[in-house]
Each structure stands twice: as structure tokens, then as C-alpha cells.
């Protein structure tokens, strides 16, 4: 039976290896390879009034990365444009067509993408465009030929072994620019509200520097003067947002524009100058979110028709399934079946897939083992994107399950963590304060679960707009 001191000790032990626990202690920009080389080139471009193009991504991390870089460049009165690729028209990240579209720029900066853009980098070189890549995805064996590459995962980068998102990499570049441009009073903390959206949405580990940034960022969101947050507070009729609100309400909302239409609308929403402008963009985003929910529900149901529950890896596909929601469906399948899931949308001779993992299982490495069958892939240990010839789908499904079976050890266990058994009398305001002290909960700091023995359900009632929550009153046996 756990007492409160034991609960404190168990939760404290999760952070025993954390080094950076204060904002003043977090790693410096100089610890990211090429950061100051990139900053000096950007400073030169600003001073010479060169046209700078910022190329982002269509998820929350990419949208936020673009927004904070745009805010800094605006503060510097720089000459710049932004391009967030359209999922359906442009595809993912910097590519040849986007370089051609931006060939009037002399400097291109990627945020949350670019580490695999080898062909696009060559075209930049041919056109005399300097390319600065900022990314956090796993680098390929051969890096693009860029002017500078800022990625904590690249070789010979002294940055600590902590998973950070694309917006954080962009934020660190701005930190280097602050030094290079001698902006002593420039407020780097003003980006923490937006940064927190990206860290939570991209499911970064909530330990070490990520933990302190999110704790401070949540406070910033709740006191933020940005029109976008004021509009969101009004929409949800909430004055205070917590981690779960960001994760389950705000992040999916902002993501929906890129999933259904164009992520640039969410970028403009985050950059809104006043409440009227923010409300206009929010109305559009809410329509996209409603459409996303409807399509997600339909696809989730149809995706389960051909699932073999005996296989280690769920692989399913369909003709012209909506590309914007297959990632969410993969997440839901992984959660339901407690095993990794890959969902493909077939469009003629090619299929695009989205993979989601569970527990500590490295889905990206497993996908990489089937590289000979793929047209392309990329991502993280927990999530990945795939492009494959439609004719190879059955081969891929068989091969990836065989590859998983041959691995002697694999961990599909989820992050749900039952700390132990507690006495009902221990559930009081003091316990709530203890649990609140160790917030925010998320990756690597799962919300603690407790076991009650001998408790009976006295009443149960569905609550909420969609009756998706259950209010239970328990009675001691």
C-alpha cells in the first residue's frame, strides 16, 4: 500500500537523470553544430536586404517553427517570404518544385524539414541559393549539400542526448541570431507559448529541458496577449489551459488545416494581429476540424475490415483514403490493438503511409529494414511516413511482420504506469497537490495510475458535449 511519501519518491525518480531543470541551465545555441555559421549568413542577408524564404511543414511543429522564425524576421525588418508545403499539392518538405517556386530568393531556411532533401539541395547549389537546413528528424547516411545544417541528431553535434522538436531547433537558431546581431534585450521567452504547442503536439519527452520549457510555456499560454490564444480561450470558454487541453483540443485544431486543406491558414491564425482577424481564421479551422473528425471516424471503422489481430504489426490500406487523417487513424489503431500500426492511402501506382508505434518500439528502424521495397521514408522512433509502390504493399506487409517476429526482443508495452495500490482515505487535496507538482504529464512522464481494491461502482454517468467522458462514484466495499 503506497503512502504519500512513497508516491513522491516514485514520481521524483523519473527525473533523477535530468540535468537542465531551470531556464538558465538549458543547453546553449553553440552546442548545436552549424548554428552560428547559419546565424552569420542570415544576419548578412538581413543587412543586405536579400530575399529570405522560410520553408516549413504542415503539422503543428512545422507551423510553429515557421511562425517563430517569421516573427523574428519581422522584428528585424527582414525581407522574407514563407512557404508551408500543401500536403496534397506539394507533398512533404523542401523539394525540387518548391525550390523552383522560390528561385528569386538568395537564401532558403527550412524549419522542421530538409534533412533528407538531397535533390532539392543540389538544385539550390546550381541556382546559387544558399540553403540552411534546420530539422530534428533522423539524418540519412548522406546529408544534403547545404550551406549549414542544424540538427541535434547529426554526427559530431555536441548537443545533449535529448529529443527536441523542429520548433526548438528554430528557436535555438534565433538564440544564436540574438548573439550574432547583438540584440541584448531581445526576449527569447516570448516564444515559449508557441514553442509549448510544438513540443506537446510532436510528443517530445517531457524531461530535462523539455519539461522546464513546457512548464513555463503553459503559464505563458494562460497569460498570453497573442490574439490567437485569446480567440481559443473564447472558443472553448476557458481561462486556463493545461497539458491535456493542448494535447487533445488545441493541437488537433491547429493540425486540422494542414490535414484537410492548407496549413498556411493555421500559420496565419498564429500570426493574427488582432482578435477579429484571429476569429476569422479560427472559424475556418473549426470547419476543417469538424470535417477531420467525420473523415477520421469513417476511415477508422473501414480500416479494421482486413486487420489480422494475430500479426505483430498492423498494416492496412485502401484506395484514396484521405491522406490528412491516416496518421490519426494509425494512432487510434495502435492504441486499440496495443501494437504498431501502418495505414496506407493508395493513389494509382503509389501509396503513402503513416506509421505509429507503441511503448518503446522503434518503428522507424523496422521500416528501414524494408528499404528495398520502399520509394522513401522518414520520421522518428514513434512515428514515420512511407511512400511505396502499390504493387509492393502485400510484400511489405509480410516482410515487416517477419522482420518483427525475428527480433528477439521488442517492447510493445505502453506508457500507462500503475504506481501501486492506495487506500481510498489517501485520496484528498494533499494527494492532488502532490500529483500537480509533478505535472506536466506526457511522454516519459506518464500520468500516474493507482489501484483501488475492494471498491464498488455506486454510479456511472456519461458527461461532456459528446458524452465521451465517464463520471464514476466509487464506494468502499
Q: Model segments located where?
A:
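Short alpha-helices
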Residues: 143-182, 188-201, 208-210
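A contiguous loop/helix-start segment that scaffolds small-molecule binding in enzyme catalytic cores
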Residues: 223-226, 406-477
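Hydrophobic helix-and-loop "lid/oligomerization" segment in the mid-to-C-terminal part
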Residues: 2-107, 127, 178-398, 409-417, ...
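Helical lid/core segments from catalytic subdomains that handle acyl or acyl-like groups
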Residues: 403
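Hydrophobic, small-residue-rich alpha-helical packing segments that form membrane-like cores
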Residues: 68-167
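Histidine-centered active-site/metal-ligand motif
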Residues: 136-137, 152, 322, 380, ...
Amino acid at each position: 500500500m503506497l503512502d504519500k511519501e512513497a508516491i513522491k519518491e516514485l514520481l521524483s525518480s523519473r527525473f533523477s537523470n535530468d540535468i537542465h531543470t531551470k531556464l538558465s541551465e538549458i543547453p546553449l545555441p553553440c552546442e548545436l553544430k552549424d548554428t552560428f555559421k547559419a546565424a552569420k549568413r542570415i544576419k548578412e542577408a538581413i543587412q543586405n536586404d536579400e530575399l529570405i524564404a522560410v520553408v516549413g511543414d504542415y503539422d503543428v511543429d512545422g507551423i510553429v517553427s515557421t511562425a517563430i522564425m517569421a516573427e523574428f524576421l519581422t522584428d528585424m525588418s527582414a525581407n522574407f517570404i514563407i512557404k508551408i508545403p500543401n500536403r496534397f499539392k506539394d507533398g512533404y518538405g523542401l523539394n525540387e518544385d518548391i525550390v523552383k517556386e522560390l528561385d528569386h530568393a538568395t537564401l532558403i531556411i527550412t524549419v522542421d524539414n530538409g534533412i533528407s532533401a538531397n535533390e532539392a539541395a543540389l538544385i539550390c547549389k546550381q541556382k546559387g541559393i544558399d540553403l540552411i537546413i534546420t530539422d530534428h528528424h533522423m539524418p540519412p547516411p548522406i546529408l544534403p549539400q547545404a550551406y549549414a545544417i542544424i540538427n541535434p541528431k547529426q554526427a559530431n553535434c555536441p548537443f545533449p542526448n535529448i529529443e527536441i522538436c523542429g520548433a526548438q531547433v528554430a528557436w535555438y537558431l534565433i538564440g544564436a541570431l540574438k548573439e550574432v546581431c547583438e540584440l541584448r534585450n531581445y526576449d527569447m521567452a516570448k516564444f515559449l507559448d508557441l514553442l509549448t504547442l510544438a513540443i506537446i503536439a510532436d510528443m517530445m519527452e517531457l524531461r530535462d529541458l523539455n519539461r522546464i520549457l513546457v512548464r513555463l510555456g503553459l503559464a505563458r499560454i494562460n497569460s498570453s496577449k497573442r490574439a490567437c490564444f485569446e480567440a481559443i480561450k473564447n472558443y472553448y470558454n476557458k481561462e486556463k489551459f493545461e497539458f491535456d487541453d493542448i494535447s487533445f483540443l488545441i493541437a488537433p485544431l491547429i493540425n486540422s488545416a494542414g490535414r484537410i486543406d492548407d496549413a498556411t491558414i493555421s500559420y496565419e491564425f498564429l500570426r493574427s494581429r488582432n482578435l477579429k482577424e484571429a476569429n476569422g481564421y479560427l472559424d475556418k479551422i473549426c470547419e476543417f476540424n469538424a470535417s477531420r473528425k467525420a473523415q477520421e471516424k469513417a476511415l477508422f471503422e473501414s480500416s479494421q475490415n482486413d486487420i489480422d489481430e494475430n500479426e505483430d504489426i498492423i498494416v492496412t490500406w485502401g484506395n484514396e483514403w484521405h491522406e490528412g487523417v491516416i496518421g490519426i487513424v494509425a494512432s487510434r489503431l495502435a492504441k486499440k490493438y496495443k501494437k504498431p500500426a501502418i495505414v496506407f492511402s493508395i493513389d494509382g501506382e503509389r501509396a503513402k503511409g503513416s506509421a505509429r508505434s507503441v511503448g518503446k518500439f522503434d518503428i522507424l528502424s523496422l521500416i528501414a529494414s524494408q528499404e528495398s521495397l520502399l520509394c522513401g521514408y522518414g520520421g522518428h522512433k514513434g512515428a514515420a511516413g512511407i511512400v511505396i509502390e502499390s504493387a509492393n504493399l502485400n510484400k511489405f506487409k509480410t516482410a515487416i511482420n517477419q522482420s518483427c517476429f525475428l527480433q528477439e526482443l521488442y517492447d510493445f508495452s505502453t506508457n500507462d504506469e500503475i504506481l501501486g495500490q492506495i487506500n481510498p482515505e489517501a485520496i484528498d487535496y494533499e494527494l492532488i497537490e502532490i500529483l500537480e507538482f509533478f505535472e506536466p504529464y506526457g511522454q516519459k512522464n506518464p500520468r500516474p495510475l493507482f489501484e483501488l481494491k475492494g471498491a464498488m461502482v455506486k454510479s456511472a454517468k456519461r458527461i461532456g458535449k459528446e458524452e465521451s467522458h465517464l463520471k464514476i462514484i466509487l464506494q468502499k466495499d
